[in-house]
Amino acid sequence: RVGRWVAIAGCGHTEITDAVVKPVLSCTVIGKSKRLIASSGAKSGDDLVMTKYAGLEGTSIFASDKIEKLKNISEDTLKEARDLSNLLSVVKEGKIASQMGANAMHDVTEGGILGACWEVATCSGLGVEVYADKIPVLDCTKQICSELGVNPLRLISSGSMVIAIENGEELVAELAKNGINATVIGKFTNDGLYIVNKGEKQALDEPDVDELYRV
């Protein structure tokens, strides 16, 4: 089916190599938008909203690819973790956030939720305060990350999105009406990149190697 659409598009390149053991498909889409919401559009005073949960994709990958290191985790928990792969699209929340007047949006991939917060703040030329205790983490993610010794807040989190918007709670309520969990986890400021944990401020560092690659 992919080959049929490539033929219709009139382009494509296929290569077979021993180094790649699974199919890899990439594409570039060019189009027009009435309003572009980039990662660089956050404004000082905006709420920082996060959709879904930290570490979604990383949790699913671990539960599928690192079974030999997760023998202490129940099969029910592993199944729940693997099923998180069904939550990786952010199209729905992106459309809603756009309609609600979001100033910036960024999908959370490598570097995890903390990396995404750092990226939006620096791209926007702002500071940010991220409230660590507000970041939602599923129990299956906590169990698996604890077993593997990794930080879920620095784990690839495709399926989650960070959004800068003036009234975060209104967006959270609208997303909830559409079955999407969302949480206000911080605020954009004029300067300073911080994680606030139990009332204490710590520097929010530039993202390093994703926790996925440390296992």
Residue spans for each PLM region:
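Glycine-rich anion-binding loops of enzyme active sites
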Residues: 1-67, 187
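Active-site-proximal betaalpha loop/short-helix elements
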Residues: 82-157
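Active-site glycine-rich loop that binds ribose-phosphate moieties when present
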Residues: 26-38, 76-97
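Short, solvent-exposed amphipathic alpha-helical segments in soluble enzyme
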Residues: 64-68, 117-125, 145-148, 173-181
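Acidic, Ser/Thr/Pro-rich beta/coil linker or hinge segments at domain junctions
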Residues: 176-215
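Structural motif
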Residues: 6-8, 24-28, 46-49, 53, ...
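Helix N-cap motif at beta-to-alpha junctions
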Residues: 164-170
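Solvent-exposed alpha-helices and their adjacent loops that cap or buttress functional pockets
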Residues: 16-22, 39-43, 61, 73, ...
